[in-house]
Amino acid sequence: MIEKIYRTYLEIKSLNDLNEVKRPTEDYSINLVDPIDFQLNKFFYKQIGKKYFWKDRLEWSNQTWIEYVSDEKLSTYVLKNNEEIVGYFELLFHKTKEEAEIAYFGILEDYFGKNLGGYLLSQAIKKAFELDINRVWLHTCSLDHKNALKNYLSRGMTIFKSEILKTKIA
């Protein structure tokens, strides 16, 4: 079935514009994945993405995953509750444009409803601005979690582009 998908691009241009959500408890931490671990990125992509029709990377070989996570422009961060993994985000830095893209972002379904999305997004934005950039951006679509767009806007991001795509959903 062909379906209309609404894609929205959002940005934040200053850390001063961030409406930060603080860490829920001391049990939660944000950790840079170092050394890189393509299996972790692959796990999150599959587990979080299965509900939201993330498909473009499903056919990637392990070698393609390794090359992707080895790119010096990419940083992956994991949200943990003590030692249990909860969610993640991938930051892609575009040095020449002095910007960072939140390429992928999400929380495992077992942790839905715990108000962790706002905290994770706040941390993604803060980590991106640590590298002296002028803008953090991302895109979301109507297939993503029902609270995704609300979360982005609540953190201080603004819409800079919208589009309608037609795609096959199966």
Which role fits each region the language model picked out?
Residues 86, 159-160:
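Short hydrophobic beta-strand segments in globular cytosolic domains
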Residues 112, 138-148, 160, 165-170:
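Conserved beta-strand-loop-alpha-helix junction that forms the acyl-donor binding cleft
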Residues 58-60, 72-76, 80-99, 103-107:
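A conserved beta-strand-loop-helix scaffold within acyl/acetyltransferase catalytic domains
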Residues 75, 134, 158:
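Short acidic/polar active-site loop segments enriched in Thr and Asp
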Residues 1-29, 34:
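Acyl-donor-binding surface of acyltransferase catalytic domains
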Residues 128-140:
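Conserved GNAT acetyl-CoA-binding A-motif
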Residues 22-57:
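Short amphipathic alpha-helix that is part of the acyltransferase structural core
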Residues 108-122, 131, 143-147:
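Conserved glycine-rich acetyl-CoA-binding loop
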